[in-house]
Amino acid sequence: MQAGLIDSGTAAPAFVLPDQSGTTRALADYAGAPLVLYFYPKDDTTACTEEACAFGELLPKFKGVQVVGISPDSVKSHAKFAAKYKLSFPLLADEPPAGGVPQVCTAFGVWQEKSMYGKKYMGVVRTTYLIGPDGTVAQRWDKVKVAGHAEEVLAAAKTLASGASITSRAEPAAKSGANAPSAAPKKATRRKAVVKRGSSKSATSSRRVTKKKASRR
């Protein structure tokens, strides 16, 4: 049964896969930081190469954000692809078992029926997930068009990565707000001053009335 795409706010499916060097990578390894997980159909094809190179060129700008590619290709295929285009981020091999389907691609809903020249077949639909530090999907791009995609993902990743710092910057404001009541005594002092001035006027008026009565007598 084909799994559906993962919606925003939903926990991303856990995975454990080897990268181009044979190192095992798991979703849990990226906990605590944003993760760009992009699925692509095949190594060293035109659109897939353009997409990989675009992420590679922008990689230094993904500060605090991990970028990982996944396709059904083998570790050996990934190694050649990464070496040819000098890709320094992980490419995970979701190689399907004989007669089976790629497990992680299926879990993320990107293993779908496709059509080319009137023929239908199963394959990876180009999809990108932005996963938050808590492991939930923050954003998803479906049926990705390569041109400008890496830049769009970078902008969204920066916004997500800045979320924690924005929260921490808001805390001092809340603390300073707690000191706001200190202004109240000043207002009270002014009110007291008004009362005193009013009472002094009343006293003066009463003295004037007394003097007038005395003069009449």
Regions found by a protein language model. Give the residues of each.
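Chalcogenol-based redox active-site neighborhoods
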Residues: M1-R217
